[in-house]
Amino acid sequence: RLILCKKSILVEGDSDELVVQRAYMDTHEGRLPIQDGIDVMTVGGVTFKRYLEIAQTLNKETAVVTDNDGNIESVKKKYKEYEEIQCIHICVDEVVDTGDLKLSDKDFNYNTLEPKILKENGREAMNNIFGTNYSTDDEMHKYMRTHKTDCAIAIFESATKIKYPEYIMRAIKNE
């Protein structure tokens, strides 16, 4: 797929793929990325680098959409060797968000796709899209965390457009 496409956007998971595809549609008159020769591929966090090696060899325009997981320096270090490669673009949120929510006595990670979408759009908008009625952001965070795919499908299929995190917009506009 990487060889055949005009450009690729590499994402971590299925939910990310659906959201990136919808963001593209919302900014490209309803066209799916593939209609413009752009393949959005779920490759998982550990295989990004192998795809980037191939993209570099082929000089293929490639964007990586990845979470910062609360450690931007770690992401920068991981992809440092691709900083100067013109055809490769690492798209990561430059902001580390924190909060008080705990899940099973562990700190909630506010630095993944779902919390970033909630931050951009607010609880009311997300309640409308998901058909839920949560009264706190923490409740919405828990719901989105445990229903990642359902939430991504709801966003993808919604008649309502949402706001997308800046790092996703960077990936789809980098043409």
Where are each of the predicted segments found?
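Acidic, divalent-metal-binding catalytic cores of TOPRIM
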Residues: R1-E175
